[in-house]
């Protein structure tokens, strides 16, 4: 009984709860024994955690979830890869907010970048607190937005993206700690055919932007895995499948 000496009551949905309580000499509560309120057992969840992910409490989801950020310069296949994975496997994807709000990259205003950063931050915070799927795909992130900010407004303090005038109000150190980070970063290199849909920088500018992005990630202590393969989807898909296999193994082995 050494490991149970501080336990006063045992709670569960099966009859063995009573037997354990009698043996230990403590109180017990048996609830929903006929599974009228919760029509699923822990054994079912353990047997297929992907299918029954929604039944896990947020704290457990946060332990098992894996956040994958796909970053890189323009026209490198980030959105295409994320959308294909979302459609194929049903994992939640956080979209590239800038593409939703900006007509052309080089015409992006400071106010729009501030809005993009804020929306991205709120979305990432939400999926961090209660992950809706075991794999969360990020089509870029807040660091990419910060990189655009520093690239377009070269002499403006980075903290202005949060609405502060200078570092006397909010420091870059505070900004560093505020940024939400993924578990894995893939950086798509600018070595595939460039497609300009009318909203992007020129190909030469996109390559300069790529270097700026990598410097931004380095500033935040992140060294993304560089992807140069032409079939980028396959690279990320294999990584996702390996992570899911590891998750299932880990979940099943826990008592």
Residue ranges and their predicted role:
Residues 74:
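The conserved Walker
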Residues 1-67, 71:
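Classical nucleotidyltransferase
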Residues 115-180:
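Glycine-rich phosphate-binding loop used to anchor ATP phosphates in small-molecule kinases
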Residues 47-68, 219-255:
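Charged phosphate-binding loop/patch that engages nucleotide di/tri-phosphates or the phosphate backbone
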Residues 78:
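Conserved lysine of the Walker
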Residues 153-232, 248:
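A glycine- and Lys/Arg-enriched "phosphate-lid" helix/loop adjacent to the NTP-binding pocket
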């Amino acid at each position: 009984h050494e490991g149970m000496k501080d336990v006063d009551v045992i709670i569960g949905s099966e009859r063995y709860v009573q037997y354990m309580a009698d043996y230990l000499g403590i109180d017990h509560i048996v609830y929903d024994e006929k599974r009228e309120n919760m029509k699923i057992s822990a054994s079912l969840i353990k047997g297929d955690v992907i299918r029954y992910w929604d039944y896990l409490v947020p704290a457990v989801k946060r332990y098992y979830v894996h956040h994958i950020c796909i970053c890189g310069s323009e026209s490198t296949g980030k959105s295409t890869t994320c959308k294909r994975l979302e459609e194929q496997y049903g994992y939640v994807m956080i979209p590239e907010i800038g593409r939703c709000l900006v007509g052309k990259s080089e015409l992006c205003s400071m106010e729009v970048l501030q809005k993009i950063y804020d929306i991205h931050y709120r979305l990432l915070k939400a999926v961090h607190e209660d992950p809706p799927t075991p794999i969360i795909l990020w089509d870029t992130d807040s660091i990419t937005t910060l990189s655009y900010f520093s690239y377009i407004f070269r002499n403006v303090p980075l903290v202005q993206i949060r609405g502060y005038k200078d570092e006397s109000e909010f420091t870059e150190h505070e900004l560093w700690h505020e940024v939400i980070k993924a578990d894995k970063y893939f950086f798509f290199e600018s070595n595939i055919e460039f497609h300009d849909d009318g909203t992007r920088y020129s190909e030469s500018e996109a390559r300069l932007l790529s270097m700026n992005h990598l410097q931004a990630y380095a500033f935040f202590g992140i060294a993304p895995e560089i992807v140069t393969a032409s079939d980028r989807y396959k690279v990320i898909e294999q990584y996702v499948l390996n992570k899911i296999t590891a998750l299932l193994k880990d979940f099943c082995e826990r008592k």
